[in-house]
Amino acid sequence: MTKSELKVKRIKNGTVIDHITANRSLNILNMLKLPDDETAIMVAINVESSDMGRKDIIKIEGRELSQDEVDKLVLLAPQATLNIIRDYQNIRKSHLHLMDEITDVVTCSNPNCITNSNEPIQKRFAVQNKQPITLRCYYCERTMEYDDIESQF
């Protein structure tokens, strides 16, 4: 596809999340608490990709993601590319990378885990598998997969 064949129009300022696993963009919008009454969003679902076969793309006009949102995004779309757009120019392109350990982003799905008590303890998970994502709680060793993670957002 050439640049003249864009399926979704360019945005002036904001964020573009590209290379999302096909049919996962709605989970990301839910995590970002979008749509809302003020933010223009463009979503392409299950479009052709030379690298991935099929992918999703999200364009968010007038908003850049917070670090907290990026930390959650990497769990839902670890292979995604995050682009910051200003005055129609891509000023920063970041390839998301899932670290070997995740801290204070999600909660253990085990209701008896110490992290779900009133104790002031850090929520820590080892990344057992990056694709598909599997996390293991540092304290109780409960494993969590994509659906367990996504349901928290």
From Swiss-Prot:
Its cofactor is Zn(2+). One of its GO terms (biological process) is 'de novo' pyrimidine nucleobase biosynthetic process. GO terms for cellular component: aspartate carbamoyltransferase complex. It holds the Pfam family PyrI. The keyword Metal-binding applies. It comes from the Archaea. The keyword Ubl conjugation does not apply. Binds 1 zinc ion per subunit. Zn(2+) binds at residues 108, 113, 137, 140. Keywords: Metal-binding, Pyrimidine biosynthesis, Zinc. One of its GO terms (molecular function) is metal ion binding. Contains catalytic and regulatory chains. Involved in allosteric regulation of aspartate carbamoyltransferase. HAMAP family: Asp_carb_tr_reg. Belongs to the PyrI family. This is Aspartate carbamoyltransferase regulatory chain. The lineage of its organism: Archaea, Methanobacteriati, Methanobacteriota, Methanomada group, Methanobacteria.
